């Protein structure tokens, strides 16, 4: 009745769903009591105020259909008749709109005509204040500004060294001018000796300062590199499970590896070339003093470099994008192939995999070659401009010398100064591919660093878990356009109770435990532990107090002891051994040559499946969690290992709430209560013998199948 009553107020339903989308929990009845004063549903003003009270930033706008693809989705399409609905995605290529019908509680795909018929032009954009803060800290080139400010002292030292280098670069041409115009004409050997010694001193200082600048600059950029690498890894581990489930492993690895491109850019010569270019204005002033005409030729060449770069850059960027996509495909396929090597060999499909790899590799090489060709064209274009300017300057300079407007020494000095101006431009133009590549890398890496992490609403300082669990009116789906996985699930689990959950595959058993671990926030309803809403809890606080054993567990390439004591490396050995005994792992560990110091190999490859599973069980037990989840944990065990664990089950369950998910009913028959699920709903619950009395029930049917 409560759900139906809320369904009548589609504005309240929409607010609930959008709040859950932004990881914010709310009590619909409380919102209704505060803001629906006349009982007719939330008005537009009341809706905006209610959103503000939930720390949501909501904005009512009017937007033409042709511009809907530019707004942040999901958003609420507000209708004056109260028939509001959610706009989830705009497919501009096919003119389709993915919406969520709040009245029917189901996603819908509307054509252009269908959407135009129901769209009245009003939209409410919703973002969480946490996401707004996140946007302000968005990772792009501006991310490096605070880093530069942080190390401003070091960069100031680099700037001072650069000034001295430019002064030395300015002095050298003047020495050559004096030699040409004075020394050679007047045969001044003493002056020549003095200039030679002075020039040698300048060269020595220039070499020392240049090396010092490179050292200081590399030292500071290495610090920034370390900060970025540390930030990236911390952020990666704090991303929600959904991020990894929606992306290929190889694609994520490829994006992380883009850090290498940024690192090479920071530690290379590109940024020092930019510094050198900034000092070109001083050289231009001196060059103008020598010859305004020759200086205008140099100045006139600069727009040519810029226009050439503007012409090449968009094409180069597109081809770099294509190259990255092909590289990411190769990375993903390689990771998939290596991790699936047992299946590949068992099914003898190596030729098919090789054929696929050859095609993907050919595609990557082709895209890489196109990038190289275009980069070469860009560099040769720069060389053409440079050579053309050199020829013009030679012709014009010779005319000025012949006419007496310029001496030979001044012409040589001018050419040396122009070289100091053009050299940074040439280096930057030749490094333009690196600039484009690092821009792509920042964008790709930004996909990781700009993805929202698991948010901690309120960061409540909650006490130690006791073990009472409550699922209230839970409705959940993994994506807005995906089918409902859990539908109106209500379940109370008392502290210390052992609960078995059974049902067909896809009935929602494992999804319940994922909600309990706060991997996801339910679309509707609340998950409570000891009366505390998990949507408001710190996920790390929660997960440290829940032990989980899955059907397929991953062990790290460390010793058995380190794997068991993963959450606390300094854990006493006695606790490790006790947990191993409870899990039935101590005996086989003791028989190993290195015992608990045995390295298990990557993902536990050095152990059998049953041995890996028992170590995983010991790892879940070692922290003495108040809530323990066994998700098909014994299905991979042989009967002897399972028998050992089942014998210890009473000790394992003592003093904690236990949830056993299993297909084999023998695993759960001794549970205090058995929950039977079908199509996302609880259809039966009771003890083993009670459920068998219902001969028409699903549990009896599954039991009969296993007996047969």
Curated annotation (Swiss-Prot):
Annotated positions binding ATP: 503-510
Top-level taxonomic group: Bacteria
Primary enzyme class: translocase
Domain called ABC transporter: residue spans: 469-704
SUPFAM superfamilies cross-referenced by the UniProt entry: ABC transporter transmembrane region, P-loop containing nucleoside triphosphate hydrolases
Every ABC transmembrane type-1 domain range: 155-437
Enzyme Commission numbers on file: 7.4.2.5
Residue ranges of every copy of the Peptidase C39 domain listed in the record: 1-126
Family membership: Belongs to the ABC transporter superfamily. Protein-1 exporter (TC 3.A.1.109) family.
UniProt domain comment: In LktB the peptidase C39 domain, the ATP-binding domain (NBD) and the transmembrane domain (TMD) are fused.
Alphabetical list of NCBIfam families matching this protein: type_I_sec_HlyB (TIGR01846)
Function text: Part of the ABC transporter complex LktBD involved in leukotoxin export. Transmembrane domains (TMD) form a pore in the inner membrane and the ATP-binding domain (NBD) is responsible for energy generation.
Protein name as it appears in the record: Leukotoxin translocation ATP-binding protein LktB
Organism per entry: Mannheimia haemolytica (Pasteurella haemolytica)
Lineage, top ranks: Bacteria, Pseudomonadati, Pseudomonadota, Gammaproteobacteria, Pasteurellales
Designated gene of the protein: lktB
């Amino acid at each position: 009745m409560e759900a139906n009553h809320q369904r009548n107020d589609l504005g309240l339903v929409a607010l609930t769903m959008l709040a859950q989308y932004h990881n914010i929990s709310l009590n619909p009845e409380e919102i209704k009591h505060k803001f629906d004063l006349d009982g007719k549903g939330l008005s537009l003003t009341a809706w905006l105020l209610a959103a503000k009270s939930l720390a949501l930033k909501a904005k009512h706008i009017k937007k033409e259909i042709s511009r809907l693809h530019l707004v942040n989705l999901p958003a609420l399409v507000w209708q004056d008749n109260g028939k509001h609905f959610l706009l989830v995605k705009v497919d501009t290529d096919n003119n389709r709109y993915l919406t969520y019908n709040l009245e029917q509680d189901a996603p819908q795909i509307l054509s252009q005509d269908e959407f135009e018929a129901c769209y009245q032009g009003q939209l409410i954009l919703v973002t969480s204040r946490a996401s707004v803060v996140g946007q302000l800290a968005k990772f792009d080139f501006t991310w490096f500004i605070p880093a530069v400010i942080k190390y401003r002292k070091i960069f100031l030292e680099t700037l001072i060294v650069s000034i001295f280098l430019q002064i030395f670069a300015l002095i050298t041409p003047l020495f050559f001018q004096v030699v040409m115009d004075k020394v050679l004409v007047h045969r001044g050997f003493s002056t020549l000796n003095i200039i030679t010694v002075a020039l040698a001193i300048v060269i020595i200082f220039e070499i020392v300062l240049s090396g010092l600048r490179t050292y200081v600059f590399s030292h500071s950029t290495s610090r920034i590199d370390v900060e970025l690498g540390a930030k990236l890894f911390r952020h990666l581990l704090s991303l929600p499970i959904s991020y990894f489930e929606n992306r290929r492993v190889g694609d994520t690895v490829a994006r992380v590896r883009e850090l290498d491109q940024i690192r090479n850019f920071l530690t290379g010569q590109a940024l020092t070339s930019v510094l050198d270019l900034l000092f070109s204005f001083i050289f231009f002033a001196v060059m103008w003093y020598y010859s305004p005409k020759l200086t205008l030729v140099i100045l006139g060449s600069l727009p040519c470099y810029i226009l050439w770069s503007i012409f090449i850059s968009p094409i180069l960027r597109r081809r770099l994008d294509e190259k990255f996509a092909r590289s990411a495909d190769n990375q993903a396929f390689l990771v998939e192939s290596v991790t699936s090597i047992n299946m590949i060999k068992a099914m003898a499909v190596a030729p098919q995999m090789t054929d696929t790899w050859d095609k993907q590799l050919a595609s990557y090489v082709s895209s890489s070659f196109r990038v190289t060709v275009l980069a070469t064209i860009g560099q040769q274009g720069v060389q053409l401009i440079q050579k053309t300017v050199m020829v013009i300057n030679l012709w014009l300079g010779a005319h000025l010398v012949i006419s007496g407007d310029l001496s030979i020494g001044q012409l040589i000095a001018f050419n040396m100064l122009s070289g100091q101006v053009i050299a940074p431009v040439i280096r930057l133009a030749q490094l333009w591919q690196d600039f484009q590549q690092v821009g792509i890398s920042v964008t790709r890496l930004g996909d990781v660093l700009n993805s929202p992490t698991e948010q901690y609403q309120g960061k409540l300082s909650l006490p130690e878990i006791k073990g009472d669990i409550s699922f209230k009116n839970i409705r959940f789906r993994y994506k807005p356009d995906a089918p409902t996985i859990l539908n109106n699930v209500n379940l109370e689990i008392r502290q210390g109770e052992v609960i078995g959950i059974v049902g067909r595959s896809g009935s929602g058993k494992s999804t319940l435990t994922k909600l309990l671990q706060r991997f996801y926030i339910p679309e509707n309803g609340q998950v409570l532990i000891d009366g505390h809403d998990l949507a408001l809890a710190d996920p790390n606080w929660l997960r440290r107090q829940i032990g989980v054993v899955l059907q397929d567990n991953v062990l790290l390439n460390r010793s058995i002891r380190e794997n068991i004591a993963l959450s606390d490396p300094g854990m006493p050995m006695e606790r490790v051994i006790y947990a191993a005994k409870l899990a039935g792992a101590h005996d086989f560990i003791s028989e190993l040559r290195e015992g608990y110091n045995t390295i298990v190999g990557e993902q536990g490859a050095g152990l059998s499946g049953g041995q890996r599973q028992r170590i995983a069980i010991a790892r879940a037990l070692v922290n003495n969690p108040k809530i323990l989840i066994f998700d098909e944990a014994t299905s991979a065990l042989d009967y002897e290992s399972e028998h050992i664990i089942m014998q210890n089950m009473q000790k394992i369950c003592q003093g904690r709430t236990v949830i056993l998910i299993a297909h084999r009913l023998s695993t759960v028959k001794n549970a205090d209560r058995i929950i039977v699920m079908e199509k996302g709903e609880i259809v039966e619950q009771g003890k083993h013998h009670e459920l068998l009395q219902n001969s028409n029930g699903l549990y009896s049917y599954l039991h009969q199948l296993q007996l047969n």
